[in-house]
Regions:
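Secretory targeting signatures
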Residues: 1-17, 34-37, 45, 262-287
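Local sequence-structure signature of Cys/Sec-based thiol-disulfide redox active-site neighborhoods
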Residues: 4-11, 17-18, 22-76
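Short glycine/proline-enriched loop/turn "hinge" motifs that connect secondary-structure elements
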Residues: 28, 105-106
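Short loop/turn microsegments at loop-to-beta-strand junctions
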Residues: 35, 109-110
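Proline-centered helix-kink/hinge sites
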Residues: 53, 110-111
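Short, conserved sequence motifs used for protein processing/export or organelle targeting and
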Residues: 78-105, 112, 126-265
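Short strand-turn-strand beta-turns centered on an Asx-Gly dipeptide
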Residues: 114-118
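Short catalytic/ligand-binding loop motif for oxyanion handling, primarily in non-cytosolic enzymes
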Residues: 121-123
């Protein structure tokens, strides 16, 4: 579990068959139901196949947006990953991945699954009776911030399946913790990509994240919402016509390290005098 971060959002706009560059598509609403589930994988990863099948069985009938990220850095066998995708994964999940993959301690471990951007698990060995039951339990254990009733996320796409303009907004919760920081991103997802050369023989790779795009954000409506608008060029689909767009909102709360030393407990200018006094007392005791 990652205590100081998570993800809201997950609304999807399907661009399949959208060829008119003036097409307008919108989606949005309350974010408390949809859960973002992220997977880290590679086309050569054999044990990833079992974990992904178990995950999809666990999510059957659930309101989940699945984002499957493929390896890119140092990768020669998997064609689907991106630099931006790996950079984001390392920034969000790298330290937790290292802590959960001894003794190799890698920042990008395939397979890994993350629920809500908050609950992380690496590897293919179940902790309980089965991987499916593990994943079902992690999905059900949603973060409290997904219970923020009335917090909505909306976005609109004007364009076709190759380029367009995305505009979006996201409510600021009146009771969000002090110091909470947000990053907003657009994910371009391909529903299914055929790659028979994959070393794990899966051939069809589902929900592939083809691009990760940072969204510029400004506070709007007197500070009541975040929002923005920008022109986007989309990557070409690997095959077919099955791209979709997903907007996610990543929150984090900086961890402030508490200083419990003797010096930190002394106010301001008294600290040096206090340390001097402590030193004098120590000398007196030695005498």
């Amino acid at each position: 579990m990652i205590p100081n971060q998570g993800i809201l959002g997950g609304h999807v706009i399907d661009l399949a068959g959208v060829s008119n560059n003036s097409t307008t598509l919108s989606v949005g609403g309350d974010m408390t139901q949809t859960q973002v589930v992220e997977v880290y994988t590679a086309t050569w990863c054999i044990n990833c196949v079992d974990t992904e099948h178990a995950l999809m069985d666990a999510l059957e009938g659930e309101d989940a947006t699945v984002l499957v990220h493929h390896r890119f850095i140092g990768e020669s066998q998997d064609p689907f990953g991106t630099q931006a995708g790996d950079d984001r994964w390392i920034a969000l999940y790298g330290p937790t991945s290292q802590a959960n993959t001894p003794p190799i301690n890698v920042e990008r471990s395939a397979p890994s699954v993350v629920f809500d951007g908050h609950r992380f698990v690496a590897g293919s060995a179940p902790n309980g009776d089965s991987l499916e039951s593990d994943y079902a339990g992690m999905f059900a254990d949603k973060h409290d911030y997904r219970s923020w009733n009335g917090v909505e996320s909306d976005f609109t796409w004007i364009g076709d399946n190759s380029s367009g303009t995305v505009s979006w907004k996201f409510d600021v919760h009146p009771n969000e913790p002090s110091g909470m920081e947000w990053n907003h991103r657009l994910m371009v997802v391909e529903h299914s990509a055929y790659f028979p050369e994959g070393g794990n023989d899966l051939e069809y790779y589902e929900d592939v994240v083809r691009a990760v795009i940072d969204l510029d954000a400004t506070l709007q409506d007197n500070g009541n919402e975040w929002g923005g608008e920008q022109q986007i060029d989309l990557p070409a689909a690997w095959d077919g016509d099955d791209l979709s767009l997903v907007v996610v909102h990543e929150w984090s709360i900086p961890i402030v390290e508490s200083d419990t030393s003797e010096e930190s407990r002394l106010p301001g200018f008294l600290a040096p005098l206090g340390l001097f006094a402590l030193g004098a007392a120590a000398l007196a005791r030695r005498d």
